[in-house]
Amino acid sequence: MKFKQILLPLIAVLVGCSFYSFKGSIPAHIKSVHVSPITNNTIESSTSDVIKYELEQSFINENVLKLLSLEDSDSRLDLTVISFVDKPYSYNIDDISTTGYEVVDRYRIDVKVKVKWHDLKNDLLLFDQEFLGWASYDPQNDIGSDGIDNDNDSFIDDKDDDEFGLPRESAIKIASKQITESIINNIISTW
């Protein structure tokens, strides 16, 4: 009798866990997504290409929804890059004695994207939201050896798998990756 009291709850837990899914609470009829060409309202033209690439890679890697053509898809994502800011983030005061003025030590890139997710089967707007990604970089050094936690993930340089390449381009990629992770998380938790 005691064995049954232990075994039955254990079986119920195991059966419940076997149906766990990373798709969260996406509407049951939505199995696929189409990512429309990204509108870019900024002067930084490469940003939309980087965001689209990172978003498509996230869908492939996370296996949340299948990427399909618009005609075959259950849903559609429309993205607009609405803001791109590349501004000084920190200054090196030590250079004042040499140069007579402060020198920018690091820059920060902020990218803001407006995202609309449409349910094409039921003609509904599932969400309309803005997402922000950012990263800092040292313009004088390789992002993989600058001693900066460029994406605020507690990893620096060779311990961080996304800190490599040209500083500014890498910062754009890091900011884009943050945006796409936020979009995927929002899709998973929409309902």
Q: Which residues does each PLM region occupy?
A:
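Surface-exposed short loop/turn segments
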Residues: D78-S145, G165-L166
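Residues embedded in well-ordered secondary-structure elements
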Residues: I6, G24, L68, E102-V104
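C-terminal/domain-edge helix-coil "capping" segments
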Residues: H118-D128, L132-W191
